Structure formats: C-alpha cells, structure tokens
A protein has these predicted regions:
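Short beta-strand/loop motif that positions the catalytic acidic residue
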Residues: 107-108, 114-116, 120
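Active-site nucleophile loop of the alpha/beta-hydrolase fold
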Residues: 38-48
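Catalytic histidine neighborhood in serine/cysteine hydrolases
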Residues: 129, 133-150
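Alpha/beta-hydrolase fold nucleophile elbow
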Residues: 6-17
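Gly/Ala-rich beta-loop-alpha elbow adjacent to hydrolase catalytic centers
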Residues: 16-20, 24
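Catalytic active-site module of serine/aspartate enzymes centered on a nucleophile-bearing elbow/loop
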Residues: 146-177
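Active-site nucleophile elbow and catalytic-triad environment of alpha/beta-hydrolase enzymes
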Residues: 87-104, 110
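Short alpha-helix in the alpha/beta-hydrolase fold that links the catalytic acid
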Residues: 110, 124-133
C-alpha cells in the first residue's frame, strides 16, 4: 500500500497509535522516503524478560489467551473498540518484531511528532524516551498529562488531532518539489 501511495504522491507521512505506531516506525526504518511520522504511545522497546517469560509459561501451561488490554482511557464514557481477549502467541510475536524495531531506530531520519501519555498502563512511557534518543531525524514530543494509552479517544484527542494536522501540513508542504 505504501509503494502505491508513494508512486502517486509527492510525499507520504505515516501515523499510528500503539502497535500502529510500532508499525509506522518500522515502515520509516525500511522506507527512507517516508516524509514524516506522527505516533501516539508507540511500542518501540520490548518488555522485560520477566514479562515474556511469564507469557511463555502461560502458554506452556496450556493458556492461549489472556484478558484483553483495551480501553486504557481516562475519559469516563469513552470506550475503545478492542478485542476482549489477547492471543498470547501473537503478543510474543509482537515483542519479537519490536526487538527489530528498536534495533533499527537510528535509521529513522524523517521528522517525528511523538505523543506520550505519562499515565500509560499498556506501553511504558520509557519507550518514547528510547525513540527520542535513537532516531536521527528531529523529534517533537508532546507530553499528555491527562490521557491514558488510547489518547486519541481520551482527554487530549483534540490536541492530538490539531497538532498532527499542523505538523504534517508543515512537513509535507516543505517536502513538495
């Protein structure tokens, strides 16, 4: 899809939340023509070995699923459309992929707009610190004090939308020939 879009457009930016942010970063690592990234609470560092070991032990014990992790949202009444269960083998596969993402962060050279929730119960905010330290392109971080992980449905959703539009408009306008 990126290849088709890049063939038709002067510049392409990629936006993602959580695992979508991980995938956006991965794409920028592998496709240097990505003009910009805007990511919200991306997972770019795998969890510690205790966490992965616990999941592996659950699988070895016969468990294939765990309760879902959706709707980490501070705003009362806001609900994320998420799976009610978490497939454990898929989680381990995600963590393996994130190891690759972390290893190649220094290959990201495009401008990055990074939104980080300080009270994220899904992705450790330290993941954002690693991204800021390792990417080679300029990073603008927006700290979200009131929103949890799914910040695009939380208190700061309007700020995320406005800042993303402003950032991408500037970067993509500058990227036009």
């Amino acid at each position: 899809a990126f290849t088709e879009l890049a063939a038709r457009c002067d510049a392409v930016a990629v936006v993602g939340l959580s695992m979508g942010g991980s995938l956006a970063v991965w794409l920028a690592e592998h496709r240097p023509e990505v003009a910009a990234l805007a990511v919200v609470n991306p997972l770019v560092t795998p969890p510690d070995t205790a966490t992965t070991g616990f999941i592996e032990a659950m699988i070895e014990g016969g468990d294939e699923i765990a309760p879902g992790i959706g709707s980490d949202i501070a705003l009362e009444g806001s609900v994320e459309s998420a799976y009610p269960e978490l497939p454990l083998r898929a989680a381990l596969s995600l963590f393996e992929g994130v190891e690759e993402v972390e290893a190649k962060l220094d290959s990201v050279t495009c401008p990055v707009l990074l939104f980080t929730s300080t009270q994220d119960h899904v992705v450790d905010p330290k993941s954002s610190n690693v991204l800021m330290e390792r990417v080679k392109g300029p990073v603008e971080q927006v700290v979200l004090e009131r929103s949890y992980h799914v910040a695009t449905l939380d208190y700061d959703k309007d700020e995320i939308e406005a800042r993303t539009v402003e950032f991408l408009s500037g970067v993509l306008t500058a990227a036009r020939p």
